[in-house]
Amino acid sequence: MCRDIKANARESVLTNQLLRSGTSIGANIHEAQYAQGKKDFISKLEIAQKECFETEYWLELLFETGYISETVYKPLQNQFGTIRRMLISSINTVKKNDK
């Protein structure tokens, strides 16, 4: 999607931010797999969660400014909502089991 927007010479600042935050989610989840302990694991998942919130923001901004259509926006919004809920659930489970 970012490549399509840029190819049409429509926007670059927002799509760069979207690409950065969106890829950071996966990078932090991957990094959490190699955490040095539970605190580090939780920290990486919390960073991924924050990046997910940021990605949702950039998507909303691209939609509200007309750079992406509703047919592009809605499925992505749903996917990132699902990812966010999974991260929240995982964080809460680890914290609960750590007590």
Regions found by a protein language model. Give the residues of each.
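Short, C-terminally biased terminal segments at protein or domain edges
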Residues: M1-K99
